[in-house]
């Protein structure tokens, strides 16, 4: 009987080892696929907010880490540094609108060296379907209204929704969400305008993060 118990114990031990190995292998393969998919999605977004004509460098690798309250959060954000023929041309920077209707709205803003907004995309949000979710390009083209805009000393009041006297449309039944996004984009542009040279001169420590 003792021999049978030992035999069963050995079988269970082998089974446990094999199962653990299979789980580890599956995780490793899945993690690699997830990482590749995330990298692909990142490149797609970066190329939307910084068009190809502005860069010939690998944007996803030309990345630096930024921490500033101007970006709406105490968390570390990513900034992607575009170059063309070895010369700085634009920056895509992550930012947070902390005061969305249902919480934080994460954005990425592409800004040319002359301060012109090249593109804005929403990376994450929890806004109400049919109302605040119109900030998402998959739902409406509202976010394209930032393209070509600049922030200057003379147009500060324009960077508001129309209900507040500005130039950006609000949504029917949802003013809080677009108001939050407009302010967040404005602050991101101001931050990049103020720190452009510093950002381009920073090392690129965030590859793979």
Curated annotation (Swiss-Prot):
Modified sites of kind FMN phosphoryl threonine:
175
User: What cofactors does this protein use?
Assistant: FMN
Q: Which GO terms describe its biological process?
A: electron transport chain
Q: Does the keyword Cell inner membrane apply?
A: yes
Q: Which family does it belong to?
A: Belongs to the RnfG family.
**Bilayer topology:** Single-pass membrane protein
Q: Where does the UniProt annotation locate this protein?
A: Cell inner membrane
Q: Any idea which UniProt keywords this protein has?
A: Cell inner membrane, Cell membrane, Electron transport, Flavoprotein, FMN, Membrane, Phosphoprotein, Translocase, Transmembrane, Transmembrane helix, Transport
SMART domains the record matches: FMN_bind (SM00900)
Q: Which organism is it from?
A: Vibrio cholerae serotype O1 (strain ATCC 39315 / El Tor Inaba N16961)
Protein function: Part of a membrane-bound complex that couples electron transfer with translocation of ions across the membrane.
Under Enzyme Commission nomenclature, its number is: 7.-.-.-
Subunit structure, as described in the record: The complex is composed of six subunits: RnfA, RnfB, RnfC, RnfD, RnfE and RnfG.
The protein's name is Ion-translocating oxidoreductase complex subunit G
* GO CC annotation: oxidoreductase complex; plasma membrane
The answer on whether this UniProt entry bears the keyword NADP reads: no
GO molecular function ontology, one term from the record: electron transfer activity
Q: Which InterPro entries match?
A: FMN-bd, Ion_transpt_RnfG/RsxG
**Where is the chain membrane-spanning?**
9-29
Pfam families for the chain:
FMN_bind
Question: Principal place where this protein is found?
Answer: membrane
């Amino acid at each position: 009987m003792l021999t049978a118990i030992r035999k069963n114990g050995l079988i269970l031990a082998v089974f446990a080892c094999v199962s653990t190995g299979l789980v580890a292998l599956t995780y490793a393969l899945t993690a690699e696929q997830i990482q590749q998919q995330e990298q692909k999605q990142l490149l797609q977004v970066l190329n939307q907010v910084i068009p190809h004509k502005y860069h010939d460098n690998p944007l996803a690798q030309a990345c630096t880490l930024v921490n500033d309250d101007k970006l709406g959060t105490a968390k570390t954000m990513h900034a992607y540094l575009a170059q063309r023929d070895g010369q700085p041309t634009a920056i895509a920077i992550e930012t947070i609108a902390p005061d969305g209707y249902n919480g934080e709205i994460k954005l990425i803003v592409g800004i040319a060296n002359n301060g012109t907004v090249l593109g804005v995309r929403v990376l994450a949000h929890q806004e109400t379907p049919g109302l605040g979710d119109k900030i998402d390009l998959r739902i409406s083209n509202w976010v394209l209204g930032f393209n070509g805009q600049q922030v200057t000393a003379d147009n500060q009041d324009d960077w508001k929704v129309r209900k507040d006297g500005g130039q950006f449309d609000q949504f029917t039944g949802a003013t809080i969400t677009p108001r939050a996004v407009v302010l967040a984009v404005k602050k991101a542009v101001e931050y990049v305008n103020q720190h452009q040279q510093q950002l381009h001169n920073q090392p690129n420590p965030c590859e793979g993060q």
